[in-house]
Structure formats: C-alpha cells, structure tokens
Amino acid sequence: MAKLDFDRSKEHVNIGTIGHVDHGKTTLTAAIATVLSKKGLAEAKDYASIDAAPEEKARGITINTAHIEYETEKRHYAHVDCPGHADYVKNMITGAAQMDGGILVVSATDGPMPQTREHILLSKQVGVPKMVVFLNKVDMLEGEDEMIELVELEIRSLLSEYGFDGDKTPIIKGSALKALEGNPQYEKNIEELMDAVDNYIETPVKELDKPFLLAVEDVFTITGRGTVATGKVERGQLNINSEVEIVGFTEKPKKTTVTGIEMFRKNLKEAQAGDNAGLLLRGVDRNDVERGQVLAKPGSIVPHSKFEAAIYALKKEEGGRHTPFFSNYKPQFYFRTTDVTGGVVFPAGREMVMPGDNVDLVVELISPIAVEEGTKFSIREGGRTVGAGSVTKILK
C-alpha cells in the first residue's frame, strides 16, 4: 500500500490502550485499525503484527512498544500499545510515548483487575488528562445485562477514586475480537468508541504554544561576542532579543537577554520546539551557565530540590540492580542533560524497593534544579541506569 501523506490539516493526538493483561488491548488496537481501514483512514493491522512490538530505548531503558497511526474524520492519531505490564509502567514513567488520552480496556467477564487499578493510578500520576473506556468481551455475557451494569458502575467508581471524572467518562460496550472478524454490529461499536475518543479527549496544547524551555547541553565563549549555550528546545519558541532565565543549581534564577540564535552555523530570528540551537547570552560569564541548567521564559519554571515521584526500579535482567535498595539510598538522578545526587524517603510501612518494583517515594536533591510536575528522570549508579521516575508533586 502506498504511504499516506501526513495531513497537517487534521489535529494530531497521541493515545494509547491501557488495562489488565488479556483484557483485549492489542485485539482492540487491531480492531480500530481494521475498521478504520475500510473507510480508507488507516492501514489494516492484525493482532500478530502489533503484538510483535519492537524494542526501543528511552532514558537508557528498553521498552517494547507498538506504534500505529490512523485517522478519523476529525483527527490524526498516533496510538501506542505495549505487550507486557512492565512495558506499560516503564513507558508511562519514562514518557517514551506521550499520551494525551487513554483507552482503558476492561473485560466485561472479569471486571476491573489489579493492573486496571494500577494503570489508572499511573495515568493520573504522569498527567494523562482523560480516558475513554472500552468494555470488551460483552458478546460472552449476552442476556446478562445486570452483570454488565455492575461492571460499569465498578469502573466509574474506580475512575473517580483516582481523580478522573467517573460519571462523565464515556463507556463503550463491544467485542474487539468480533469487530476484528468483521461482525457489522461490533464494528459499529468501534466507530462509537472512536467518536467518543474524538469528542471526549481534548486536543493537547501544541508544544509551540507552551512557555519556552531549552535544556543546556554545552557552553562556550565566542571572543568579542560573549557566551553561547547550546541544547535542544523542549517546548515553546523564542525570538531574538527576548529575555530568558538561567534556571537550576542556584536558589535564584539569573535573567539575561538572548542577542543571537544559531542553528547549523546559520543565524536565525527565532528558535522553536525541536530545534537544536545555540543562544548567545548578553552579559553572561561562561561560569554563570552550565550543562544541566535550562534557559526558560522568565517565571515559567523555578528550581526545586524536593518532590514526590513515581518510580520504576529495573529488574536485574533489564540491566538494573541485583539487590533491593533501602531508604538511605543515594543514587544520581539524571534530569534532561545532567546527573544530580539525591536521597530517597520511602512511604510509611515500606522498608525496601526490589528490582522490578513500581513505587512512590520522596526525592531530595543536593542542589535545586528546574523541575515541575510531570518532569521525567532516570535513576543512575555510576552511569548505569537502574530506574526511571516521573515527578508527581513538588514539595520544596
């Protein structure tokens, strides 16, 4: 099949399937692609091609993720599906595949299970704003409407418990397998599901519209002109002669003006999200800015040293530690471009973290750096990644 041209006229949204093992996430992903392919909006995919998810690396961690894309009449979607539970946890915590919304898949025959709860909690912690529910396998409960209603109530109360709007969340009933097999009644449910995703999950704020932030990777001096900081623009855009703050490692950010912007040795009028750019900073000494700091729109981000985080400790087979760690553990926390040493405090009643655990804890860094809720980091020992984390709440 010829490659579809990327159509920028449609809004782009990133979504993913989440839910308990064997509740039908991958079958649903295949069903969505297959049903939409009949309208020429996607390439049909079978279960096996999605299930054979390729490995990718994010923050030094290997994750298996399948990425597929499709369109509805309204939008263009990038959809991520992970084969294993640990892949979900790693994916969410590293932010490898950003999710603007989730499709929570729950089997009507089982109802919510432990990983259903875990994925809802994790989605809340890493900032997935909304989800739509697909109640799968209802074909196995024909005539048992009361049972289906009970499961639906259970899902709504679970969503509310974790801070989602359980009452307003759309719940679509269907059978992913029957839709994949071409049953017209169940294909219609997939169309209903995508209508709900189109209408209930909001279009995210474009990276360009967010406040400017560049993570400093390198600093050098140009004789007679001043100090240049280079790095990747994470978000927003910046015009020449704009003010920025140098944030991180000091209690108070330092303000400066950008007098020149360079990319690939060419002068630019502006830098925007995704660019690798060099910014010439007025009146800044080479020692005033270093790798690991950020240049940001004044007032948009402040340095912090203490926060709550959701973390995943890698298993031994994943290159992680061979032994648990305890509450006096002091690894390096790698944010954007640099390592900062810090300590961890466990929640009450927890004595240790085993390789493979997913846990919430408090981190206190030895020097403040630019972080906000949702900032991702790696946990490292001597340059080796042993875990990943996401900031869930700022404390200091």
From Swiss-Prot:
Q: Name one Pfam family in it.
A: GTP_EFTU_D2
Quote the record's binding site residues for GTP.
19-26, 81-85, 136-139
Task: Give the EC number(s) under which this enzyme is classified.
Answer: 3.6.5.3
Q: Where is this region: G5?
A: 175-177
Q: Does the keyword tRNA-binding apply?
A: no
- Ranges where the record places region G1: 19-26
Q: What is this protein called?
A: Elongation factor Tu
Q: Lineage of this protein's species?
A: Bacteria, Bacillati, Mycoplasmatota, Mycoplasmoidales, Metamycoplasmataceae
Q: Which gene encodes it?
A: tuf
